[in-house]
Amino acid sequence: RKHIIYMKMRKSLLLLTAAFMSFGAQAKVRLHHLVSDNMVLQCSSEARLWGWDTPGKTVRVSTSWSKDIVTARAAKDGSWEVCVRTPKPGFTPLTITFDDGEQTTIKGVLSGEVWVCAGQSNMEMPVHGFDGCPVEGYNDAVIDAANFSGVRYAKIPSRMSMSPEQDADTRW
């Protein structure tokens, strides 16, 4: 009798565990850190947007500037990507919605000129300078920055890796 009760409890526990695991498998779409609030898209072009989801899941992407809906299916590794046409440059904040059954919307997106700067140590210096070596006029530049809300900045951190990185901890 105890053995039967034990087996029923074990079966119930396994079913409960499987149910909780299936809820976890219904993961919400995850975006690359560059695809985030306040991002800037290169104007009048095609922009690549990408992220991850449950393998086989369909991701629908819609934008506030177009009626078009672009879709992608997550690959075996969960990765997906789409290309969307971008509007003319402007300072009107835009939105992009990603829908895999659960919506994720990024806000404050601008369409404009995107400049990528790269280099060595000269590109590592923060706007305020290094400790004990401030940049002349830094305080005035910070105060004046409030007048340029359309200028966005994203710093991709330097990391050493023996293999290509899939994401970078970056915010606009």
Residues of each region from the PLM?
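Short, Lys/Arg-enriched N-terminal segments with co-localized hydrophobic residues
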Residues: 1-8
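Intrinsically disordered, low-complexity sequence elements enriched in Ser/Thr/Gly/Pro
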Residues: 8-9, 26-28
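Hydrophobic h-region of N-terminal signal peptides that target proteins for export
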Residues: 17-25
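Sec-dependent signal peptide recognition
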Residues: 10-15
